Amino acid sequence: MLQACRVLRSRAGPSPGSWQPLSFDGGAFHLKSIGELTRALLVLRLCAWPPLVTHGLALQAWSQRLLGSRLSGALLRASIYGQFVAGETAEEVRSCVLQLQNLGLRPLLAVPTEEEPDSAVKTGEAWYEGNLSAMLRCVDLSRGLLETPDPTGNALMQLKMTALMSTRLCKQLTSWVRRPGDSLELSPERLAEAMDSGQDLQVSCLNTEQTRHLQASLSRLHRVVQHARAQRVRLLVDAEYTSLNPALSLLVAALATRWNSSGEGGPWVWNTYQAYLKDTYERLRWDAEAADRAGLAFGVKLVRGAYLDKERETARLQGTEDPTQPDYEATSQSYSRCLELMLTQVSHRGPMCHLMVASHNEDSVRQATKRMWELGIPPDGPVCFGQLLGMCDHVSLALGQAGYAVYKSIPYGSLEEVIPYLIRRAQENRSVLRGARREQELLSQELRRRLLGRGLRVSPH
């Protein structure tokens, strides 16, 4: 956990005179204890070791057999779980978030539940209804974690749609949406009306059982957003695989039609756009223009993307075109274009357009802060930044100290719930974990400074 010390920080942001680039040299690491620095360094080095990531679940099972559940669990809590997870109980989560808030950072809670593609078919709605209850509790917890009791304040929360509906249904809807002319039967307006009224929805591409599940899924989504709106919690819907995303985007559009209207106070439902996909810029541009024409608020979380290896392997096995950018440089260029598009949208539409720059890349963060200054976007306004809990703290802390709105994505739950989730995220984010070498250098440097009195810092690059 981050050291619980109250620090002085600027809420006004950068000077209005000339733009000063942020320095990500690890200077803000002085806010962390030696124990926190040591654990972060060890865990990040472990996570950069490919065999641990590849065989994580098998290694966890082996450690339980060898050491027993209690000792194995204690080791995980002292290492990976303690680094990346807020805790299991509401009190543990509050304690973690308080420490983040003391450092100028904000919580973005995530329920670590999702349905993997092609997982076993679930009988009935019980599993999804249980996840609905967890999501509603997360909304309440997110609201309760606001730094001030101001009733007009807003919290943010992540939402995995595949915790509330079957991935098989998502694939079925995706194939239907992609068929020219047939997608009108599943328009966002029709789905929004079905959510609001609760009336039966007839869809020709689905059988009776699938239609019943779609109806139940729409009801669950509606209940989550309705409760989040009442509690003033904005929902950031996660993007997933390309085989699911068109269906997820359709449902986000339906929710936006109902909850992102101009009289609702900004976007309550945001979509996530993955810059590593070739078509992302055009989709983002089209969606932004469509929202503007319809008078809807527009919320975007912009990420590079986490499913690169799986997307390429799926395309190879199916003999289809690879949907991803050819290399990291192309992905970075795509991210930069999408970022410029959205910052321009924010400058034109003001509070009707919100953006989270969800990136661990220092260049992308610098580009965002510079363009915000050039466009006159306040640092604590409709643009915020996001990084994972336990990673990229040298960027998060520098942003927070400069007065920018910075969120840490925070999973919480029991070891049994969270460790498989963390291992899946690690497998999807191999490049991010391998790319954390600079953060490891900065952590090592701060430890040397503390223990040996060496004051040199790694130069920014």
UniProtKB/Swiss-Prot annotation:
Keyword Iron tagged: no
GO BP annotation list: proline catabolic process to glutamate
Gene3D superfamilies noted in UniProt: 3.20.20.220
UniProtKB keywords: Acetylation, FAD, Flavoprotein, Oxidoreductase, Proline metabolism
InterPro entries per the UniProt record, alphabetical: FAD-linked_oxidoreductase-like, Proline_DH_dom, Proline_oxidase
Pfam family, one: Pro_dh
Modification N6-acetyllysine, positions: 310
Keyword Acetylation (UniProt): yes
CC cofactor: FAD
GO-annotated cellular components: mitochondrion
One Gene Ontology MF term: proline dehydrogenase activity
Pathway(s) the chain acts in: Amino-acid degradation; L-proline degradation into L-glutamate; L-glutamate from L-proline: step 1/2
The enzyme's E.C. designation: 1.5.5.3, 1.5.5.2
SS bond partners: none
Catalytic activity, as annotated: trans-4-hydroxy-L-proline + a quinone = (3R,5S)-1-pyrroline-3-hydroxy-5-carboxylate + a quinol + H(+); L-proline + a quinone = (S)-1-pyrroline-5-carboxylate + a quinol + H(+)
Family under the similarity heading: Belongs to the proline oxidase family.
Function: Dehydrogenase that converts trans-4-L-hydroxyproline to delta-1-pyrroline-3-hydroxy-5-carboxylate (Hyp) using ubiquinone-10 as the terminal electron acceptor. Can also use proline as a substrate but with a very much lower efficiency. Does not react with other diastereomers of Hyp: trans-4-D-hydroxyproline and cis-4-L-hydroxyproline. Ubiquininone analogs such as menadione, duroquinone and ubiquinone-1 react more efficiently than oxygen as the terminal electron acceptor during catalysis.
PANTHER family, per the entry: HYDROXYPROLINE DEHYDROGENASE, PROLINE OXIDASE
Name of protein: Hydroxyproline dehydrogenase
Species this protein is from: Bos taurus
Lineage: Eukaryota, Metazoa, Chordata, Craniata, Vertebrata
Gene giving rise to this polypeptide: PRODH2
